[in-house]
Curated annotation (Swiss-Prot):
Residues 77-120, 141-167, 204-283, 343-365 are annotated as: Disordered. Residues 241-256, 343-355 have a biased composition (Low complexity). The modification Phosphoserine is found at S122, S162, S232, S234, S255, S273, S299. This is Protein FAM53C. Disulfide bonds: none annotated.
Length: 393
């Protein structure tokens, strides 16, 4: 091992020693041409791995960047540049170095949204490359101004920039669906669900293979898709969408029926603003209750509730007359109550100043009159009240 390393270091010059790192190359002895491929256990430098060792005659897999894979080894070997066949071939460091981007080939960044699209949602730059499948929408409310001016004919004509023509042959291997988007070749996964709402400035067909599920394009497999508009409430239609849009002067009778409507619903009247097939129902009219169904609330009959006087009033007057006392009946029992004074008060019968001799005799009568007067104030006869009428109210 040491002798092999010293011999290889002696063969190298000072100009070739650009990298001092070493890699272990362990080719497995699974073929008969072992001595031609070198010692199975050896340490070789990365700069001299293809010059110091003889070339092996085993099968190699080569790609576009001159990388060859040794099937019987545990490492990747770089093929040496052939000096006789291609004298103008650049060195390996220039081949592997990334090329500076051409400013003409860079995609133009999307223009900032106008004031009309201030409410548009923000989308990352990577997601703005997805192209949704365009479906015509005949709505005249949310159509952008440039398409409305071209379709109506009456407004100012805004010049519409057509996308650049690209010479590329695209195979359409699968019918487009709602989830089929145009993606670069290095994105094999399906686009996210909210990419369907991305507006589209230029309609470009996509191709996909049903076996692998990857998107392919013959001429534009490495070039990114053109920059698209971000999320917006107003859909931006493709350049070929003007023939589906009804003009501003069109009427339901003059404009043709759209092809995506069901056959059974083509005779329904069309809406002027939105393509709704249920315009026969007047959805804008409020459904009010009929007058017959409305039941009138029962009113309170206060005359019926107050048709009887206080109970016990007549009994109080009769008891006062039977006793023969000079005490007048209380003010609330008289038909025409006199003004309140010291001689005519509600509690006159109970608040008179009595002597000590008469206090014991009049004690029982006084308490009875107080209890009776309280009953007349608080108690009423609710027998004739209509309780059902009160509960309904």
């Amino acid at each position: 091992m040491i002798t092999l390393i010293t011999e290889q270091l002696q063969k190298q010059t000072l100009d070739e020693l650009k990298c001092t790192r070493f890699s272990v190359s362990l080719p497995l002895p699974d073929h008969a041409d072992i001595p031609n491929c070198g010692d199975p256990f050896q340490l070789v430098s990365e700069g001299a791995s293809w010059r110091g060792l003889p070339h092996c005659s085993c099968a190699e897999f080569q790609d576009s960047l001159n990388f060859s894979y040794h099937p019987s080894g545990l490492s990747l070997h770089l093929r040496p540049p052939s000096r006789g066949n291609s004298p103008k071939e650049p060195p390996l460091s220039q081949v592997l170095s990334p090329e500076p981007p051409d400013p003409e080939k860079l995609p133009v960044p999307p223009a900032p949204p106008s004031k009309r699209h201030c409410r548009s949602l923000s989308v990352p730059v990577d997601l703005s490359r997805w192209q949704p499948v365009w479906r015509p929408a005949p709505s005249k409310l949310w159509t952008p101004i440039k398409h409305r001016g071209n379709a109506g004919g009456g407004g100012p004509q805004v010049p519409q920039q057509s996308p650049p023509k690209r010479v590329s042959s695209l195979r359409f291997l699968q019918a487009p669906s709602a989830s089929s988007q145009c993606a670069p070749a290095h994105r094999p996964y399906s686009p996210p669900f909210f990419s369907l709402a991305l507006a589209q400035d230029s309609a470009q067909p996509c191709a996909t293979s049903p076996q692998s599920g990857s998107w392919e394009s013959d001429a534009e497999s490495l070039s990114p898709c053109p920059p698209q508009r971000r999320f917006s409430l107003s859909p931006s239609l493709g350049p070929q969408a003007s023939r589906f849009l009804p003009s501003a002067r069109s009427s339901p009778a003059s404009s043709p029926e759209l092809p995506w409507r069901p056959r059974g619903l083509r005779n329904l009247p069309r809406s002027r603003s939105q393509p709704c097939d249920l315009d026969a129902r007047k959805t804008g009219v409020k459904r009010r209750h009929e007058e017959d169904c409305r039941r009138l609330r029962p009113s309170l009959d206060f005359d019926k509730m107050n048709q009887k006087p206080y109970s016990g009033g007549l009994c109080l007057q009769e008891t006062a007359r039977e006793e023969g006392s000079n005490v007048s009946p209380p003010w609330f029992m008289a038909c025409s109550p006199p003004p309140l004074s010291a001689s005519c008060s509600p509690v006159e019968g109970s608040s008179q100043v009595l002597s000590e001799s008469e206090e014991e005799e009049e004690g029982s009568v006084r308490w009875e009159r107080q209890a009776l007067s309280k009953r007349t104030l608080c108690q009423q006869d609710f027998g004739d009240l209509d309780l059902n009428l009160i509960e309904e109210n």
